[in-house]
Design a protein with these regions (language model features):
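Conserved "right-hand" nucleotidyltransferase catalytic core of DNA-directed polymerases
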Residues: 60-186, 243, 270-469, 479-486, ...
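Extended two-metal-dependent nuclease catalytic cores across DNA- and RNA-processing enzymes
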Residues: 1-77
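Conserved catalytic alpha/beta cores of large enzymes that bind or transform nucleotide phosphates
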Residues: 203-209, 218-219, 475-500, 511-544
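Conserved catalytic core of nucleic-acid polymerases
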Residues: 321, 325-328, 404-407, 432, ...
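Short, conserved charged micro-motifs
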Residues: 189-193, 368, 677-684
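Active-site-proximal helix-loop-helix substrate-binding element of RNase H-like nuclease domains
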Residues: 1-15, 124-130, 168-305, 313-323, ...
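C-terminal structured "cap/appendage" subdomains that terminate the fold
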Residues: 59, 86, 649-699
Length: 699
């Protein structure tokens, strides 16, 4: 190892762009260094090295000497710290998590934790657990003895995805300290009935971590889950919505200073192995079940202090069941139509590629940034885009801007090629996701978006384009299933602007909504001082960009870029807007000022987002936090509204005994499958519940 720099000087180092001696590999170089006791002596006796490798070495001697000079470590630098200061010390786990959360270094965090000794991960050891495997016929007795009072922690083992699942075992940890493992694959009829009865009992309080997946598996066994009092994943998310990852092991260390293991002295006899049997899966599951109870208490205490406990109990927890119901239902697709659509997009990709090659007069790899850089900026002489480490960027936004400037036909074909590839990939993802029942069962995630918005994955049904004709063709693949009559969609029109009007109490915006006319046209008529019927398409487009951009911290420069107008015109437009809707400006200023003072923003239902960078000395980080502060209350309130609407609609469907069902949530839109003869009743029900989910000053 001490001679690696000398070896690298001979064979080269690609990371430092140092060329090696042609024909000399690591084995040859190592042999030479051993024979001549180092590079310096090897260079001194270069004439003695034989063979073609020796000739190559002599021909590139200057390169070798230069390489060694360049890769030499500086050894006489004055260090601003002493060796003692570099000694390994205790670390602030909370600060590390906050830093990694902010930087979104999720994989690096996992690697860091893996490298740390166990004693560094916790200061208070593991969990005290005394567990047993429940024998045949012993389920009811154990439940009666331990699970009728207090909260019971559950940890389910099995698999669940695509709207279905299967359980293999369940670990229970009772409030009195007892724990048990239930192998559900070998249950007797009596034990099955006893556990199913307790599991469905609303009066038997239960806590879980990420309950939605196991709920699908519970349903698959014909069981029901009642009395879910806490979900530690959701509670942790509400406390720190920017964290992104809510692993149980990480949360127990962060909030309880304990790791997921059995504490020494966990059993009465002081033995660390506090189990009556030796099975890693079941033992680990019981530890997790015990951890869930303690963690739920800690998180709920903190949520109560921060005003988020009601949001957990009344919105996020019950929404878990609603989302699981939607996932299990899925949505039917026309498989033949999807295959035809894939073939169409594939043909369009090939055609766009051929058109691009025809303009150039030769084929290139349209997916290679390096080749595109050479063609666009060297061969075609186009204006340079933004500089990156690997050259001039060729991302979609930059190429679209470049096309707007040049209107070059090659760029037109390149952009279409990329667009058709994206559409083809979307269809491919849908085709791979069709289950045996002919339906697609997406998975909804409540803990991804810091604003509170739901996410869809496997596949993501929220990223299907709807603003283009081709994107709308993809939506046509979703059809009504057998035994149902039609699909029904209902969405919130301009929900973010309605929230803006409500929260700002701006009379102008409230009146614009109350008029029942096109919102953007009405606001444009006020800004430009013309009657609503005199508003042109260009006027409406400018004000529409303003309306939607305000909640994202839109600046005059950003507006000018978006509308392709001069910055001075954009600044004047914003000034005119705020003169007409002054309370909006006051509200936006107040959002940031309040968040800077309190450290967080808040939605209609009290959903908080903490933004410590609002007081950062780094201007870039501070401005990013300010934009987030503007956006979080609006986006978060929109999330609150549609979540409440989903709960209200689901409850009303059950209360009215309707067979129609809610299938999808896509941003501000809900999709329903309508049972025969229920359309009118469903429309009225959905309109009522969505319209009154949260009372606001606007209709």
């Amino acid at each position: 190892p001490s001679r690696y720099p000398e070896l690298a000087a001979l064979v080269g180092e690609s990371s430092d762009n140092l060329p090696g001696v042609p024909g000399v590999g690591p084995k040859t170089a190592a042999k030479w260094l051993d024979a001549y006791d180092g590079l310096e002596n090897l260079v001194r006796h270069a004439d003695e090295v034989g063979g073609k490798a020796g000739e190559s070495f002599r021909a590139h001697l200057d390169d070798v000497v230069r390489n060694r000079r360049l890769n030499a470590l500086v050894g006489d630098l004055e260090l601003p710290v002493s060796v003692e200061e570099l000694t390994r010390r205790d670390w602030n786990r909370e600060a590390v998590h906050d830093l990694f959360d902010g930087l979104e270094f999720r994989v690096l965090r996992d690697r860091l934790l893996e490298t740390l000794p166990a004693e560094d991960l916790t200061s208070e050891g593991g969990f005290e657990v005394e567990g047993e495997v429940l024998p045949t016929g012993g389920v009811r007795a154990w439940l009666d003895a331990h699970a009728r009072a207090g909260v019971v922690g559950l940890d389910c083992q099995g698999r669940w995805r695509a709207g279905a699942g299967d359980l293999t075992g369940v670990a229970l940890a009772a409030a009195d300290g007892a724990a048990a493992w239930l192998d559900v694959t070998t249950l007797s009829p009596d034990d099955d009935a006893a556990f199913a009865e307790w599991l469905a009992d609303e009066s038997a309080a239960k806590a879980m971590h990420d309950a939605k997946g196991p709920l699908l598996a519970i349903w698959s066994r014909g069981w029901e889950l009642g009395g879910l009092a806490s979900d530690t994943q959701l509670a942790a998310y509400l406390l720190r919505p920017d964290q992104r990852v809510y692993d149980l092991a990480d949360l127990t260390v962060r909030h309880l200073r304990r790791d997921l293991s059995v504490a020494a002295g966990g059993a009465d006899d002081g033995d660390q192995a506090a189990f009556s049997f030796d099975d890693t899966e079941s033992n680990d599951a019981m530890v997790r079940a015990r951890a869930v109870i303690d963690l739920a208490t800690a998180l709920e205490t903190e949520l109560e202090e921060r005003g988020g406990a009601q949001l957990l109990r009344e919105v996020e927890l019950p929404l878990t069941r609603t989302l699981a119901t939607m996932e299990r239902a899925g949505i039917a697709v026309d498989l033949d139509y999807l295959h035809r659509l894939h073939a169409d997009f594939d043909s369009a990709v090939v055609a766009a590629e051929a058109d691009a090659f025809a303009v150039l007069g030769r084929p290139i790899n349209l997916g290679s940034p390096m080749q595109l850089q050479a063609v666009l900026f060297d061969e075609l002489g186009m204006p340079k885009t933004r500089r990156t480490k690997t050259g001039w960027t060729t991302d979609a936004e930059s190429l679209e801007t470049l096309f707007a400037k040049t209107e070059h036909p090659f760029l037109a074909h390149l952009l279409r090629h990329r667009d058709q590839i994206r559409l083809r990939q979307t269809v491919e993802g849908l085709l791979k996701s069709v289950a045996d029942d002919g339906r697609i069962h997406t998975t909804y995630v409540q803990t991804i978006a810091a604003t509170g918005r739901l996410s869809s994955t496997d596949p993501n049904l929220q990223n299907i384009p709807i603003r283009t004709e081709e994107g709308r063709r993809i939506r046509e693949a979703f059809v009504v299933g057998a035994a149902y009559e039609t699909l029904l969609t209902a969405d919130y029109s301009q929900i973010e602007m309605r929230i803006m009007a409500d929260r700002s109490e701006d009379d102008g915006l409230i009146e614009a909504f109350a008029s029942g006319q096109d919102f953007h046209s009405i606001t444009a008529s006020r800004v430009f001082g013309v009657p609503a019927d005199a508003v042109t398409g260009a006027m409406r487009a400018k004000i529409k960009a303003m309306n939607y951009g305000l909640a994202y911290g839109l600046s005059a420069f950003g507006l000018s870029q978006q509308l392709k107008i001069e910055r001075s015109e954009a600044a004047g437009l914003m000034e005119e807007y705020f003169e007409r809707f002054g309370h909006v400006r006051d509200y936006l200023h107040e959002i940031v000022a309040t968040a800077r003072r309190t450290g967080y923003t808040e939605t209609i239902l009290g959903r908080r987002r903490y933004l410590p960078d609002l007081t950062s000395s780094n201007r870039q980080r501070r401005e990013m936090a300010e934009r987030a502060a503007l956006n979080a209350p609006i986006q978060g309130s929109a999330a609150d509204v549609i979540k409440v609407a989903m709960l209200d609609v689901e409850a009303a469907l059950a209360r009215n005994g309707l067979r129609s069902r809610m299938l999808l949530q896509v941003h501000d839109e809900l999709v329903f499958e309508v049972a025969a003869g229920e359309r009118e009743q469903l429309e009225a029900l959905v309109r009522d519940k969505m319209g009154h989910a949260v009372e606001m000053r606007v209709p």
